[in-house]
């Protein structure tokens, strides 16, 4: 019987003929031994236009608008009991174009979120409808080669990178995005913004005894030298604005520095969508690995209108954990978010279908996926969260078999990760359901 490690750091990827294996990691947590992990990836994120849900093949075209289907209730999005009312109110202000009305959404997830698959298309659709208020939160450097935030080119060197899904340290200081970056003098980061309209920025870092400084420049013009020195270890934030916007930021530490990420925004009105994905992540990242007080401080500072919790794929391999531990961990994660932000809207987003091959070579849905979806739906109802059924939105059981047989394929060879086209389909349905929920909210 497989025993689930806390947190689950598991990503299965098969690349047809081209395999790239990352180092095997072994660790112990709470008496459980982490099995060897192979981090492989067989998809390449692309910046291609969105395609409608009904299209199997489509040439590049402008972003489509999801077609709203107003109804009393949705089988895919359960937003009963006013679970999303706070979010809908914020979105309505942005839609009306109220000055400075910025709706912030943070999306915690696993490897597809790491590559900004699904989330990148959700961001594009929402910003097309409600206004573009900027890129949002971006990590300091790439923890994995496939990390990306659409519209941002990120390069860095000299950083010691520690994602929350590794086990070298358990101090819980992972910032908002779940990755810490430490460096001495030799490190640097350059962030190129394809849309130069970003004008409001904020550096997330750690204050600590004997901390060094970070030199910030925008478009080769010096902005500030930010001291990270502090009497005690605590979160630090440095906000700055660039008149007219910036297309390039440079960060250079001097002495010891510990950074988390940077936000890039526009004045609004509009939407900001933070994609906070960790490769191999599970719900235990939020329920155990993030330091509770530190993470609460990060959330309160970011002040999102909606927190999306999107895990389950990596847990699907661990039957015993699903039966005896998963629900408790999910409830704990929700309780942590509620304690930090009592009024925030929370949406639990189910995992996608996940396929596996039978002895005869056929592709079937892993039987643990529907069980996870059922647990998530129940917990969402019990805790006052909204719930989006990604599994059903894709087509339910057998979806990965159909998507793998599609031309072009909508899922990679690992039967886990969607192709960019598959990700766009999910994003289109998700945004359609949110927009329909907003229209229902308006007429209540």
Language model: regions and residue ranges:
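Conserved SGNH/GDSL esterase-like catalytic core that processes O-acyl groups on lipids
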Residues: 104, 113-328, 417
């Amino acid at each position: 019987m497989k025993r689930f490690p806390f947190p689950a750091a598991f990503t299965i990827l098969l690349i047809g003929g081209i395999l790239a294996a990352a180092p095997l990691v072994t660790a112990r947590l709470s008496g459980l031994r982490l099995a060897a992990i192979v981090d492989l990836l067989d998809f390449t994120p692309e910046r291609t236009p969105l395609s409608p849900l009904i299209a199997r093949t489509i040439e590049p075209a402008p972003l489509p608008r999801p077609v709203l289907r107003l109804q009393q209730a949705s089988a895919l999005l359960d937003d009963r009991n006013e679970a999303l009312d706070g979010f809908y109110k914020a979105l309505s202000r942005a839609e009306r174009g109220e000055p400075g009305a910025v709706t912030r959404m943070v999306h915690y997830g696993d490897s597809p979120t790491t590559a900004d698959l699904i989330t990148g298309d959700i961001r594009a659709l929402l910003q097309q409808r409600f206004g573009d208020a900027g890129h949002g939160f971006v990590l300091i450097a790439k923890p994995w080669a496939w990390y990306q935030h659409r519209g941002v080119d990120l390069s860095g060197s000299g950083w010691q990178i520690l994602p929350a899904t590794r086990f070298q340290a358990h101090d819980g200081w992972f910032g908002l995005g779940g990755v810490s970056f430490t460096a001495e003098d030799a490190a640097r980061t350059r962030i190129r913004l394809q849309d130069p309209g970003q004008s409001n920025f904020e550096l997330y870092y750690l204050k600590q005894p004997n901390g060094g400084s970070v030199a910030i420049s925008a478009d080769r013009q010096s902005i500030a030298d930010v001291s990270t020195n502090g009497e005690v270890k605590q979160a630090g934030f440095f906000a700055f604005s660039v008149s007219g916007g910036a297309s390039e930021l440079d960060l250079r530490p001097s002495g010891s520095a510990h950074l988390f990420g940077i936000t890039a925004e526009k004045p609004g009105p509009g939407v900001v969508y933070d994609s906070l994905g960790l490769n191999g992540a599970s719900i235990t990242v939020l329920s155990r690995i993030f330091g509770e007080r530190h993470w609460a401080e990060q959330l309160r500072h970011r002040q999102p209108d909606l927190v999306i919790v999107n895990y389950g794929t990596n847990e699907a391999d661990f039957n015993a954990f699903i039966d005896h531990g998963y629900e408790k961990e999910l409830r704990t994660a929700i309780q942590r978010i509620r304690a930090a932000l009592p009024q925030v809207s929370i949406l639990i987003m189910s995992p996608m279908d996940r396929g596996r091959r039978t002895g005869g070579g056929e592709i079937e849905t892993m039987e643990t996926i529907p069980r996870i979806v059922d647990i998530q739906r129940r917990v969402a109802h019990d805790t006052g969260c909204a719930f989006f059924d990604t599994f059903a939105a894709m087509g339910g059981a057998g979806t990965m078999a159909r998507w793998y047989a599609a031309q072009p394929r909508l899922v990679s060879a690992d039967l886990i990760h969607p192709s960019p086209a598959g990700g766009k389909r999910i994003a289109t349905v998700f945004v359609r359901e949110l927009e329909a929920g907003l229209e229902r909210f308006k007429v209540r």
